[in-house]
A protein has these predicted regions:
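Vicinal oxygen chelate
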Residues: 1-36, 40-50, 70-91, 104-197
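The feature marks the first
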Residues: 24-53, 62-65
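Short, structured motif recognition centered on aromatic/hydrophobic residues
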Residues: 41-46, 59, 88-90, 115-116, ...
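Amphipathic alpha-helical segments
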Residues: 50-66, 128-137
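Flexible internal linker/loop segments at domain or repeat junctions
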Residues: 87, 93-113
Length: 197
């Protein structure tokens, strides 16, 4: 596996995402100012696609491995992992009747499947992070999901709008007790908060 090629792919896609997401740009500037940078705090990245296996292929060919499948009412996701890199969350609508109500196909037709829908950054104190980012003009969609003291707490920024359509969001993720997974009810709630409605 070529780590240099994977680094280049991840750097290019994250840079493209940050350019098109105001919340991520604000956070990156804050982190760059301290010398931390954006890349070291990335928890996971998410691609929306019409075919999960094809969407994940560029990452799988560079060493990512399938870990788990998460299922929801009208969409599902596969999680891929590679030690030393952010988790990769790839989602799509079900290809049958169940997927008819999913927002994913419309998003993919508008924006493609070679861009990140969102990047999640790891935070130590999600409430404090929300307050500081709000002070710098970031708007959040909905409320923090997940119980205080629970394994995983998350929130999405309000989506960047392109031609009236929600494009990308920034996710803040607070994790505890070594938990690296995803909680389906929370992920579905976040998905719904990313519609811009």
């Amino acid at each position: 596996m070529d780590a240099h090629a994977l680094d280049n792919l991840m750097e290019r896609m994250v840079a493209d995402y940050v350019v098109h997401n105001q919340a991520a740009s604000v956070l990156k500037a804050m982190l760059d100012e301290t010398g931390v940078g954006f890349a070291p705090v990335i928890d996971h990245v998410t691609i929306r696609t019409l075919n999960i296996d094809q969407g994940a292929e560029p990452f799988v060919s560079l060493g990512y491995a399938y870990d788990e499948t998460l299922q929801y009412d009208d969409w599902y996701a596969k999680v891929y992992r590679k030690p030393g890199y952010p988790s990769l969350f790839v989602d799509q609508a079900y290809p049958d009747e169940r997927g008819k109500t999913s927002i994913i196909p419309g998003w993919v037709h508008k924006f493609g499947d070679k861009v990140f829908h969102h990047v999640a950054v790891r935070v130590e104190n999600i409430e404090q992070a929300v307050v500081r980012l709000k002070e710098n003009g970031v708007v959040f969609a909905g409320n923090i999901v997940g119980e205080r003291g629970g394994h995983l707490r998350q929130i999405f920024s309000s989506p960047e709008m392109v031609d009236g359509q929600p494009f990308t969001v920034l996710e803040l993720a607070e994790r505890h007790r070594g938990y690296l997974g995803f909680l389906p009810p929370q992920a579905d709630s976040l998905m719904k908060s990313s519609t811009g409605k």
